[in-house]
């Protein structure tokens, strides 16, 4: 592992924005996709104790790995559970005994450890031109930007106020725009009685160990798809999020640490966790801090919030899931506006890769789903194919490094 880079002294005033960015990242994760875990648990016929153990293991694992990686490398390395894998398990657990599924989780996690130690994944990441990476990220995030505004047709008062507040705060005090809409949104929801906390009873989660079983059927029907889905749907775009905002930590330790964490937590129910993609973008850009060297605090904050949720298991996770979907969508979309703008600027900055980057952007935004693999992978494949044909090959590493910084227009360069 490379040595930790130097960081300027941290003042108390440096904490507010990255801590809020970490909190928003956690809220969006639990409020947006965590319901898939409960659906998969229901399909598998898990008891409340086993379901709570799943929540405990994945939350604690995500929190500790993200906290460690962010501290070790002084970069905002946000981790998360594998959302596409959870969606896959909603159907897979219907026909796979739970103990065999646990064994499959462990095999998949061990494969990620091997991948990280081998260094192969980092070499693949370095091959991707920066314009293609920017186009991919912009395409992935576009639906979230659109979602912030399309929610107005369902909840015009809440969404309208949040958008109006965001624009006004951007004009008056841009640094506090995202914090402002978070506070305003929560206050409005509580005033309207749309978030009922009266019945909330915090109880410590108790992990339950399940002895894994191994079978060829689970290897082929669960472990292999789980590995491929998580690799293409989470690790690939997640690493490109970091690269797009100028962070250079190698993929190798990230894949290794999250793989080890997944391996340890699998017997307690955790299916897989990895570097985050969409929610990571909330913490890697300018909204987290003007100074990129201070954004690692967002990774620490997110890790602490995940651990806090994990300690209380289902009860605290249910609070975030109780937030209206329109609030989650609007909060996420507005928090990601800067990153979407920066990514689009980076995609079209280099004339040599502009058309291929736009193809990548549109293909990723289309969210093509084939062979059980999500749109991020196919968007990248189509974009790389277009780049290869249009440019006659991939640029050398030195050329890729040169093109990253000067080609992005200065006003947008750090406007995430």
What are these regions (language model features)?
Residues 1-21, 193-209, 391-416:
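Intrinsically disordered, low-complexity non-transmembrane regions of multi-pass membrane transporters
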Residues 2-15, 39-68, 224-296:
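Membrane-embedded helical hairpins/re-entrant loop segments and their flanking transmembrane helices
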Residues 16-29, 33, 177, 208-237:
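Hydrophobic, membrane-embedded alpha-helices of multi-pass small-molecule transporters
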Residues 25-27, 64-77, 261-271, 367-371:
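Transmembrane alpha-helix interface/packing and boundary motifs in multi-pass membrane proteins
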Residues 36, 60-62, 82-94, 279-286, ...:
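Hydrophobic alpha-helical segments within and immediately flanking transmembrane helices
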Residues 49-53, 57, 65-121:
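Membrane helical hairpin/interfacial module
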Residues 88-94, 166-167, 280-298, 386-387:
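Interfacial segments of multi-pass membrane proteins
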Residues 94-200, 301-402:
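Membrane-embedded alpha-helical modules
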């Amino acid at each position: 592992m490379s040595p930790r880079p130097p960081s300027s002294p941290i003042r108390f005033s440096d904490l507010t924005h990255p801590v809020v960015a970490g909190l928003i990242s956690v809220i969006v994760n639990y409020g947006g996709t965590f319901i898939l875990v409960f659906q998969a648990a229901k399909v598998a016929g898990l008891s409340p104790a086993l379901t709570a153990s799943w929540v405990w293991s994945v939350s604690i694992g995500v929190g500790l790995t993200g906290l460690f990686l962010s501290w070790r490398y002084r970069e905002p390395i946000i981790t998360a559970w594998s959302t596409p894998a959870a969606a896959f398990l909603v159907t897979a657990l219907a026909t796979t005994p739970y103990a065999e599924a646990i064994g499959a989780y462990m095999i998949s996690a061990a494969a990620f450890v091997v991948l990280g130690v081998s260094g192969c994944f980092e070499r693949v990441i370095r091959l991707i031109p920066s314009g293609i990476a920017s186009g991919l990220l912009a395409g992935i995030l576009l639906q979230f930007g659109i979602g912030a505004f399309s929610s107005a047709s369902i909840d015009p008062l809440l969404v309208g106020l949040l958008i109006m507040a965001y624009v006004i705060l951007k004009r008056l005090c841009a640094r506090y725009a995202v914090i402002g809409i978070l506070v305003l949104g929560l206050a409005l929801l509580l005033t309207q009685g749309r978030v009922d906390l009266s019945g909330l009873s915090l109880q410590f989660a108790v992990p339950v160990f399940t002895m894994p079983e191994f079978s060829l059927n689970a290897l082929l029907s669960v472990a292999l798809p789980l590995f491929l889905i998580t690799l293409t749907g989470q690790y690939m775009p997640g690493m490109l999020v970091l690269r797009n905002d100028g962070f250079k930590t190698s993929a190798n330790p990230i894949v290794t640490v999250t793989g080890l964490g997944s391996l340890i937590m699998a017997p307690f129910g955790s299916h897989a966790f990895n570097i985050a993609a969409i929610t990571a973008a909330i913490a890697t850009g300018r909204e987290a801090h003007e100074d990129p060297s201070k954004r690692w605090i967002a990774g620490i904050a997110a890790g602490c919030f995940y651990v806090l949720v994990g300690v209380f298991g289902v009860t605290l996770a249910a609070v975030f899931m109780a937030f209206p979907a329109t609030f989650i969508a609007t909060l996420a979309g507005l928090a990601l506006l800067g990153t979407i703008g920066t990514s689009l600027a980076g995609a079209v900055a280099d004339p040599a890769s502009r058309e291929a980057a736009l193809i990548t952007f549109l293909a990723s935004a289309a969210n093509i789903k084939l062979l059980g693999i999500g749109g991020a992978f196919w968007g990248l494949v189509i974009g790389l194919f277009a780049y290869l044909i249009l440019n006659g090959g991939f640029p050398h590493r030195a050329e890729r490094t040169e093109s990253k910084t000067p080609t992005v227009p200065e006003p947008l360069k750090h406007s995430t």
